[in-house]
């Protein structure tokens, strides 16, 4: 690969690695902001959005959960409105349904009130509900109190990703797995794919999701974090008439996970989940998928052991709910008392790419870093699909700035 750059025959100006919604939004934003910029996207799968983008709850998040001023708060609030507009413009299935966040225990009430305050600070309209008012929205849901967030919705994020790919005008190469990267700050970047192709670019953008830290290291940039994969398991509700819209528990602030929730998707089906259990591979969609090299790398990262030490109790509960449908049902019943284990039909799982620092800190905000001729998106789990248009613009801005400076 090293020899190839000496001739400086670039295949593109910007090379994006990763054909999920963030990578495709970045390609779309680059060609919008700087028409004529040549963009190539490399995606190892046979089509777009095969991992985090296509394996989530399909929720357009309002932004209520996130710290005011954080990238998650700013980009989710802006991104939710833009996502609805984008879906409407291109005829992509979506609905603004609103959602309930329900407190089922007394100790959750102060946290619920905290979400009301946070919603107001983030400019999100919120309605507070007493126990009796919950039935106005969800007759089968029980709780001590709740809040209704009107701007939450659902959409087809895979459809959005496909549309971004088409509208970007970028050259998308599927089945192109990155094997090696050779970066020369004075020349550019050459990437070798599994098929033996070499792609030369002036600037590289890393939107590799579950593999973003590996791509960063291949480029020669220490990401100073590791992706620790957490699987989220889902069920489909056999009696969808029990749930009208979206119902969430009050999240535990110690974790960047929102808890098991009920989601009526655009297909009319109701999905229940996800939990959060350590995956034994980066693409470990069930317990049978084990990749010793990836698992070894996770276990070798000091942050993984810090998480285990701090949160073993929470982890043990999640593990129990993963291995026992009865335990999972008990958790769901706190919100939806009428549900039984027979109502839960196993559905496709997702894996969340969670960035973890060396000291065990779970990175709470989106994380974008830069190196010579490179921009790396190193933490973009939920609500990144909702926020993908603003994230894409920010990554594009940095990539174009890098392009202008070379």
What is each PLM-predicted segment?
Residues 25, 181-290:
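Flavin-dependent oxidoreductases
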Residues 147-203, 207, 211-214, 387-400:
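Helical element adjacent to the flavin cofactor pocket in flavoenzyme catalytic cores
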Residues 132-135, 226-231, 236-238, 307-380:
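Flavin (FAD/FMN) cofactor-binding core of flavoprotein oxidoreductases
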Residues 67-78, 102-111, 147-166, 173, ...:
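Short beta-strand to alpha-helix junction loop
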Residues 58-133, 143, 259-261, 271, ...:
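Dinucleotide-binding Rossmann-like beta1-alpha1 core, especially the glycine-rich loop
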Residues 7-22, 40:
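Beta1/beta-strand and adjacent pyrophosphate-binding region of the FAD-binding site
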């Amino acid at each position: 690969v090293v020899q190839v750059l000496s001739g400086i025959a670039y295949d593109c100006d910007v090379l994006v690695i990763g054909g999920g919604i963030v990578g495709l939004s970045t390609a779309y934003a680059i060609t919008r902001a700087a028409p004529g910029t040549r963009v190539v996207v490399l995606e190892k799968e046979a089509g777009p959005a095969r991992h985090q983008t296509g394996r989530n709850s399909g929720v357009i998040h309002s932004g209520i959960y996130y710290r005011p001023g954080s990238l998650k708060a700013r980009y989710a609030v802006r991104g939710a409105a833009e996502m609805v507009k984008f879906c409407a413009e291109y005829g992509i299935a979506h609905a603004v349904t609103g959602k309930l966040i329900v407190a089922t225990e007394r100790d959750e009430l102060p946290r619920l009130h905290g979400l009301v305050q946070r919603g107001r600070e983030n400019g999100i309209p919120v309605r507070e509900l007493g126990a009796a008012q919950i039935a106005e929205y969800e007759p089968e849901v029980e709780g001590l109190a709740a809040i209704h967030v009107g701007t939450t919705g659902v959409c087809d994020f895979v459809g959005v990703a496909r549309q971004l790919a088409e509208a970007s005008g970028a050259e998308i190469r599927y089945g192109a797995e990155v094997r090696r990267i050779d970066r020369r700050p004075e020349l550019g970047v050459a990437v070798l794919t599994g098929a033996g192709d070499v792609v030369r670019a002036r600037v590289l953008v890393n939107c590799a999701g579950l593999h973003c830290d590996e791509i960063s290291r291949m480029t020669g940039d220490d990401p100073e974090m590791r992706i620790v994969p957490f699987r989220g398991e889902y069920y489909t509700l056999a009696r969808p008439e029990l749930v009208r819209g979206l119902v969430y528990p009050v999240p535990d602030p110690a974790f960047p996970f929102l808890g098991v929730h009920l989601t009526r998707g655009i297909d009319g089906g109701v999905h229940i989940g996800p939990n959060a259990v350590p995956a034994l591979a980066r693409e470990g969609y069930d317990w049978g998928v084990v990749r010793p090299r990836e698992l070894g790398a996770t276990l070798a990262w000091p942050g993984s052991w810090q998480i285990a030490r701090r949160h073993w109790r929470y982890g043990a509960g999640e593990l129990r709910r993963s291995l026992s449908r009865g335990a999972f049902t008990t958790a769901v019943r706190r919100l939806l008392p009428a549900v039984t284990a027979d109502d839960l039909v196993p559905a496709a799982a997702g894996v969340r790419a969670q960035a973890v620092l060396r000291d065990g800190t779970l990175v709470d905000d989106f994380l974008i870093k830069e190196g010579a001729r490179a921009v790396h998106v190193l933490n973009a789990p939920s609500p990144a699909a909702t926020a993908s248009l603003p994230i894409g613009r920010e990554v594009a801005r940095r990539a174009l700035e890098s392009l202008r400076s070379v």
